[in-house]
């Protein structure tokens, strides 16, 4: 039997060993519950096992799948960056790489003066929400009562 570890390090993130493997993997930024379950199935692991029982070989296998999921058999629609803007490849970015890619995408939209980029610049909602009553900032101005 493998020794139980309370903290397991996968892809540079500390995972809770007491949680089920699929829920523990969601602590990695860019990995949701469905993607985590797919990674477990492709790696040949039970998604319901406790993450603390992972061996070093199993951790390496999970990290390999997270680096290039499409080549390991995870479908193209499941990755978070299909047809990447710069490379044209299907990528799945996690942790700091995901943050950096999102920041670069917003900077590109601002640079080309796209509508979405301008909305980001102004700090306004980007996805078409109404702004009359929501997204207000600053002090609220009360209404004073009329003197008699």
Curated annotation (Swiss-Prot):
Located at the top of the head of the 30S subunit, it contacts several helices of the 16S rRNA. In the 70S ribosome it contacts the 23S rRNA (bridge B1a) and protein L5 of the 50S subunit (bridge B1b), connecting the 2 subunits; these bridges are implicated in subunit movement. Keywords: Ribonucleoprotein, Ribosomal protein, RNA-binding, rRNA-binding. Part of the 30S ribosomal subunit. Forms a loose heterodimer with protein S19. Forms two bridges to the 50S subunit in the 70S ribosome. InterPro entries: Rbsml_uS13_C, Ribosomal_uS13, Ribosomal_uS13-like_H2TH, Ribosomal_uS13_archaeal, Ribosomal_uS13_CS. This is Small ribosomal subunit protein uS13. It comes from Pyrococcus horikoshii (strain ATCC 700860 / DSM 12428 / JCM 9974 / NBRC 100139 / OT-3). It comes from the Archaea. Belongs to the universal ribosomal protein uS13 family. The gene is rps13. GO terms for cellular component: cytosol; small ribosomal subunit. The keyword Transferase does not apply. One of its GO terms (molecular function) is rRNA binding.
